[in-house]
A protein has these predicted regions:
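Active-site cores that bind ATP or allylic diphosphates and position pyrophosphate for catalysis
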Residues: 2-141, 146-155, 161-162, 186
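Catalytic adenosine-cofactor/nucleotide-binding cores of aminoacyl-tRNA synthetases and other
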Residues: 120, 132-216
Length: 216
């Protein structure tokens, strides 16, 4: 906040939706226009005094954010194509970005491995790490496992779960064996203990494309 990276915004959800609709109808990307960033201290104080509660956005530095993803390879985002992310809601609750980065810093996390749906979040997180003056971890974004029709598994849709395998009598070591090799170019081979599975795991062997899984 003291470095002018965190700033209050007063637009309602309806106002933001109208801005987004207007930009899209004009053929422009729905990027937040930073109108609240330009408010003076007096203007901010008046809005708060009138009862308006701000949400808080993180101002992105205008540059190309690049990292060497351990699965995807070189990934780049131009911040001019990204909206400043909201970090704190009107009620004071935190969105995912800020506590995620703070937790990684406090726990000295060296590698962050997560689904490819978080790739754009990583662009935000790298700048938040930089704002804190912290070391940026290594990142790896894995593709999602799909069924034999190419559809993603979903807990909401009652898809497969670890418990379902357990209830059907599958041994955990068998499932770990399968997960070690699926989506890689390696042939599946039986490994009987967890240490050997860990020793054989290589993140660079994970395919950049979604692997298909059939229970049959």
């Amino acid at each position: 906040k003291n470095s002018n990276r965190l700033y209050p915004c007063f637009e309602t959800e309806e106002e933001l939706a109208l801005k987004k609709k207007s930009l899209l109808s004009s053929g422009k990307p729905p990027i937040y226009d930073r109108s609240s960033f330009n408010l003076s201290k007096d203007e901010i104080d008046k809005k708060i005094s009138s009862g308006l509660k701000p949400h808080w956005r993180f101002k992105l530095d205008e540059k190309i954010i690049t990292w060497n993803d351990l699965i995807k390879g070189k990934v780049s985002f131009d911040t001019k194509n990204l909206s400043d992310p909201v970090l704190i809601r009107e009620d004071g609750s935190l969105l995912y970005h800020l506590p995620s980065v703070i937790d990684d810093i406090q726990e000295n996390i060296s590698h962050i491995i997560r689904g490819e749906d978080h790739i754009s979040n990583t662009a935000y997180h790298i700048q938040i790490f930089e704002a804190f003056g912290s070391t940026i971890p290594e990142f790896a974004h894995h593709p999602f496992l799909t069924d034999d029709q190419g559809k993603g598994f979903s807990k909401r849709l009652g898809s497969l779960s670890i418990d379902s395998f357990k209830n059907e009598g599958f041994e955990n070591i068998a499932l770990l064996n399968y997960l070690l090799f699926i989506g890689s170019s390696k042939n599946i081979e039986p490994i009987k203990n967890l240490k050997d599975i860990i020793d054989k795991f290589e993140i660079k062997s994970i395919s950049n494309s979604s692997a298909k899984f059939s229970k049959e």
